[in-house]
Amino acid sequence: MQLSFTQKKNVRKSFGKLAETLSIPNLIEVQKNSYKQLTDFDSEAGDLSKGFDRVFKSIFPIEDLNDKATLEYVSYRLEKPKFDTEECIQRGLSFTSALKCTLRLVVYEIDQENNTKDILSAKEQEVYMGEVPMMTDSGTFITNGVQRVVVNQMHRSPGVFFDHDKGKSHASGKLLFNCRVIPNRGSWLDLEYDVKDFLYFKIDRKKKIFASTLLMALGLTKSEIADEFYDKDTYSFDAKTGKWKTKFNPENYKAKNFSEEVTDAKTGNVVIKLGDKINFLTAKKLASDGLKDILVSQESLIGKYLHNEVKVSDDEEEGTFGIGTELNDTIIKQILEANISSIEISITNSINKGPYLLTTILNDKNNSKNDAITEIYKVLRPGEPPTVEIATQIFNNLFFSSDRYDLSDVGRVKMNSRLNLECSDKITILRNDDIIAIVHKMLDLRDGKDEVDDIDHLGNRRVRSVGELVENQARIGVYRMERAIKEKMTTLDIESAMPQDLINAKPLTVSLKDFFVSSQLSQFMDQTNPLSEITHKRRVSALGPGGLTRERAGFEVRDVHPTHYGRICPIETPEGPNIGLINSLSTYAKINKYGFIESPYKKVLNGIVQDKVEYLSAMEETKYTIAQANAKIDKSGKILEELVPCRENLNFVLSNPSKIDYIDVSPKQLVSVAASLIPFLENDDANRALMGSNMMRQAVPLLKPESPLVGTGIESDVALDSGVTIVASRDGTVDKIDGKRIVIKATEETDFTKSGVDIYNLQKFKRSNQNTCINQKPLVRVGDKVKSGDIIADGPSTKLGELALGKNVTVAFMPWQGYNFEDSILISERCVTDDVFTSVHIVEYEVMARDTKLGEEEITRDIPNVNEEALKNLDESGIVYIGAEVKAGDILVGKVTPKGDSASGPEEKLLRSIFGEKAIDVTDTSLKMSRGSSGTVVDVRVFNRHGIEKDERSITIERAEIDTVQQDKIVEEEILERSIKQRANQILSGASLTKKIKDLDEGTKLDLEIINKININDVFKITVGNVNDEASIAQLKDQYNQAKQDIQERFEDKVLKIRSGDDLLPSVMKMVKVFVAIKRRLRPGDKMSGRHGNKGVVSKIVPVEDMPYREDGRPVDIVLNPLGVPSRMNVGQILETHLGWACKEFGEEVKRLVNENNKKFEKTEKISSFLKSVYGKEVFDGGIEKLNKTEFSDLCENLQNGIAISTPVFDGAKEKDVSEMLELAKLPTSGQTNLWDGRTGEMFDRPVTVGIIYMLKLHHLVEDKIHARSTGPYSLVTQQPLGGKAQLGGQRFGEMEVWALEAYGASYTLQEILTVKSDDVAGRVKVYETIVKGEENFESGIPESFNVLVKEIKSLALNIELN
């Protein structure tokens, strides 16, 4: 068992029975891979070019209107972003990269006589095309200094879909089938039946036209259409017998059970007598017996349909029977009278082939391709006179031109698989064959030979990730650019122009910026804690442009579908109107190149599980039988059970191992990251698990994070992939460390052109998007060896590289004086005094000094009419000190604004404008601390416009930043020198000096100690008489100089950025941001929750001495209501409590053993045997036994708080395991114990369930919600107080509250509340007067809302007058 750097500090015992064959893929790779494909330029890519390359190729080459010039696209590149992510967040900038394109302008000379073109000139130039937002390493975008996430969108895949109206269109309830071809870009094509079974088509939901018209427009004639879709029989009239002769076809007898009399044409014998029963098998036997031609009576032709046109006279209207005419006695008589002895009949019957297309052809008045195209044109462009040329061009552009129509490679793949076509996925327009195949399918559907598609199947829904969404947006910008380029090409002198002159970069930049700022899918990142970040990046939304809307989405779309298995989590989705529309990707899910979600499976051959892992999409999966991960398997991989529960074609079945094709990779591949963090998920009701996984995202990072004693084993994956921790990028040794940075010397680096040192700057007390605190703490010591990928610093809500959202607290499930009624929570005062649930929140205050009409605002300490006490926290520049304790109303930044002096006359104004005298009067517009909050100033940032003189504070901040960068530079140079000297030692060790250097005499033997004492420049002067060694030293000198120069350049670049002015909004001269840290202790009214959806509100904080306590006197921390468990069916919390209790007791035992050993954390026989009994032999021998002295000491220190365990979802500890753990911890296996009442000292009547539960404090803090209204604003119309904390609103006294007072008969109180306390304007004034005068009488008048009601009734033309 290989332990990582952080795992050695806190080893988890796992209850998982199944070996992990596939580690969880990087949790944010969905975002990163998608955007990488957009921005990576691969010039060697032989296949379809990706990303921006594809975008530019979609419009280039651009030709001018006279064919004199073309602008061609060659390649593109993205420059390095100007500022790094940290600088962008600080300065409020967007993290973008400049997009440069190499374009070639080719100008032609046209020879009018010979009609030829010769190239006159070709100019190539790199042109700036705009700014492209770049993705940070953690999968986010920074727009205007704010971190945003682009959510993946689930939408209907392009392709062809068959469906029916579920019998709703017509009163008869008949199923009307329809089909829709959805392209990625272009017009939609629909085909549908009506009640009379005619087949129609529509383009873009316009008026419907007969489907035969579409086929004729493709170039088929009516008879070719009949031949394509129907087989035919030829009937010829035999005058001798008066019967019709035709070939004997057994197929015709499929639909009939008994038939008319049939005579063998050759012998004249009756082979089938009238009334004989005959079916397909009998008919087949007759054919094999030699029956070839038969004679049938005229009755058997009636009801059949003509396959070809039959002309019986020269009359235009009446003389022709068209294709699809249904035969009857009259028609047959007319045909015979016209001396037509042979006719062709389409083979139709009620089972195999209905005559739907034939009747459609018959009713279609169009007869030629031109007629058909003209009719389509009339529908597309009603009111415009049609000409055949224009109509043909428009029809061809609809579906058959790659400029206007694009199925996309996905659409082509889907269409090929649905219609069984063989066609390259490079062909992304419709072909005639596709439309013909679709009509065939429509006929099959009506005949019951095929089934409609399930639109909620994940094979028919695909995901658009960031890359694709941004690419589509870029395409919009580029199309706008194309129009502008074409205009410029005609107006400019093209021969002297350069590519630069034709390009305006604005449209692309604006288009991309719009998307990131205002699109529904570009969202403000949820940064409450690391889990909420990861979940946000893995979210899949069905809403957004081109998706569904909440109102239209029905139940089916929101429901869990069998294909969600292993792709989309069935548990994690919001409660409320978005339920089921916003989902989360499952743990192992990936998105393939076509945008379909795939899930991994292990191959099974002949009942033996292979190591090979394959990813399957929902379409592929339906072909196979797939077993679940917990099927019993022996060491060799053989499946042991005779019948295994499997999934096959969306159903659950029991299958024989030999028939199984695949097996799940892990039981947790079913659920999302958040759901797989819930231990004993399998014992919780789904609704409560949903609440649990949603509430974990709302947990605020606490002051002292603590990872759960009962975890699921993926806490470390979340902490690692979320990007809040610091991960070592290379192997190395920790060289220097303090609270703000870690310096690691890379051990493997021998190339001095790369830096040999990694400096990791830690984030200290930074503000997150949700005002929670981001703070990183080092986990390493000087001298520690770290490997690439090790976590070297914890971030918010992480402890030792594991996710730590809450706290392990001792819980008792029992009622306590009604204080835990209705899910309320009773908490011990210890949790407040020891800062167990204390969190730090950081609020940003911002003030701007603008240039106004009356003069410039000024940030200063010199504020009129403010006493010195109020300015005690401000420095000489008028800005608050870092570290100052501030409370509500305190000045953070002093600012004065010129006051408009309305009294001054025109003379004064003139003089003032001439002599530039300052505005005489100023008002105090200082930035003050908001009401109801107090805290400590943790950071101040000052931004100055370019060219504005900096104040003292700005210069101080600037110096401090330059000092930090200087320190980094010094450290890098030190480590570089050390590395160079070590390399020099490898070359020169043991050699003797041939020439004196400084204090070293000739002949001195060189070693590392001596080389380290010499100045680095003298090292390069060493001569030892060996040409090769001296050449190596010279090479080393070059490498050193190059590396030192790189360090110097980086330093100068950073200093330049620090010193340069800031880009501020127009008219803003200076901006100051103040960050205040507010400490939030637990208070009654705060919302708390466990991981199982067991949420509640703190009702009372009880002194420790009053809490229930155990036999040894230890009080519990939290008391929950036992009635909250049975009806909610989240029993997982009880199992967690039992197991947590055992873990805690193990910690107590470790503490006891350490105390026995004089409080030394050493490996003694007792500690070793105890740990072996808990962890088991395998884990102890494979991991813990191998730890060195320091590592073992660290482990023991951490284990004193409890031995952590992991119980993976669906593969965790069973009831038996929990009992065994309790036994091992010498605790009652019932999990219950006697408690004593802290107030009386008496024992409670019966044992109580006690243990350790993991509780979270949620981001619904009472301090943010509680408020009181004194006097405040009123609504203008109703004259009632506004609502809500932001408006300083009042408390709503609604309809039901009125009923309550009516029920009590409290009429005076009620009258007061509805009038003078609310919207009786005159009454309010009178009440105020009586209070001022000290009187006690007042009367109520008419409430304003009554007047509003009267006005509304008057607006309905009903006059009301009051007497």
Curated annotation (Swiss-Prot):
<dbReference type="InterPro" id="IPR007645">
    <property type="entry name" value="RNA_pol_Rpb2_3"/>
</dbReference>
<dbReference type="Pfam" id="PF04563">
    <property type="entry name" value="RNA_pol_Rpb2_1"/>
</dbReference>
<protein>
    <recommendedName>
        <fullName>DNA-directed RNA polymerase subunit beta</fullName>
        <ecNumber>2.7.7.6</ecNumber>
    </recommendedName>
</protein>
<dbReference type="Pfam" id="PF04560">
    <property type="entry name" value="RNA_pol_Rpb2_7"/>
</dbReference>
<dbReference type="InterPro" id="IPR019462">
    <property type="entry name" value="DNA-dir_RNA_pol_bsu_external_1"/>
</dbReference>
<dbReference type="InterPro" id="IPR007644">
    <property type="entry name" value="RNA_pol_bsu_protrusion"/>
</dbReference>
<dbReference type="Pfam" id="PF00562">
    <property type="entry name" value="RNA_pol_Rpb2_6"/>
</dbReference>
<dbReference type="InterPro" id="IPR007121">
    <property type="entry name" value="RNA_pol_bsu_CS"/>
</dbReference>
<dbReference type="Pfam" id="PF04561">
    <property type="entry name" value="RNA_pol_Rpb2_2"/>
</dbReference>
<keyword id="KW-0808">Transferase</keyword>
<keyword id="KW-0240">DNA-directed RNA polymerase</keyword>
<dbReference type="GO" id="GO:0003899">
    <property type="term" value="F:DNA-directed RNA polymerase activity"/>
</dbReference>
<dbReference type="GO" id="GO:0006351">
    <property type="term" value="P:DNA-templated transcription"/>
</dbReference>
<dbReference type="InterPro" id="IPR007641">
    <property type="entry name" value="RNA_pol_Rpb2_7"/>
</dbReference>
<dbReference type="InterPro" id="IPR037033">
    <property type="entry name" value="DNA-dir_RNAP_su2_hyb_sf"/>
</dbReference>
<keyword id="KW-0548">Nucleotidyltransferase</keyword>
<comment type="function">
    <text>DNA-dependent RNA polymerase catalyzes the transcription of DNA into RNA using the four ribonucleoside triphosphates as substrates.</text>
</comment>
<keyword id="KW-0804">Transcription</keyword>
<comment type="similarity">
    <text>Belongs to the RNA polymerase beta chain family.</text>
</comment>
<dbReference type="InterPro" id="IPR010243">
    <property type="entry name" value="RNA_pol_bsu_bac"/>
</dbReference>
<dbReference type="InterPro" id="IPR007642">
    <property type="entry name" value="RNA_pol_Rpb2_2"/>
</dbReference>
<dbReference type="Pfam" id="PF10385">
    <property type="entry name" value="RNA_pol_Rpb2_45"/>
</dbReference>
<comment type="subunit">
    <text>The RNAP catalytic core consists of 2 alpha, 1 beta, 1 beta' and 1 omega subunit. When a sigma factor is associated with the core the holoenzyme is formed, which can initiate transcription.</text>
</comment>
<dbReference type="InterPro" id="IPR015712">
    <property type="entry name" value="DNA-dir_RNA_pol_su2"/>
</dbReference>
<dbReference type="InterPro" id="IPR037034">
    <property type="entry name" value="RNA_pol_Rpb2_2_sf"/>
</dbReference>
<dbReference type="InterPro" id="IPR042107">
    <property type="entry name" value="DNA-dir_RNA_pol_bsu_ext_1_sf"/>
</dbReference>
<dbReference type="InterPro" id="IPR007120">
    <property type="entry name" value="DNA-dir_RNAP_su2_dom"/>
</dbReference>
<dbReference type="GO" id="GO:0032549">
    <property type="term" value="F:ribonucleoside binding"/>
</dbReference>
<dbReference type="InterPro" id="IPR014724">
    <property type="entry name" value="RNA_pol_RPB2_OB-fold"/>
</dbReference>
<dbReference type="GO" id="GO:0000428">
    <property type="term" value="C:DNA-directed RNA polymerase complex"/>
</dbReference>
<dbReference type="GO" id="GO:0003677">
    <property type="term" value="F:DNA binding"/>
</dbReference>
<dbReference type="Pfam" id="PF04565">
    <property type="entry name" value="RNA_pol_Rpb2_3"/>
</dbReference>
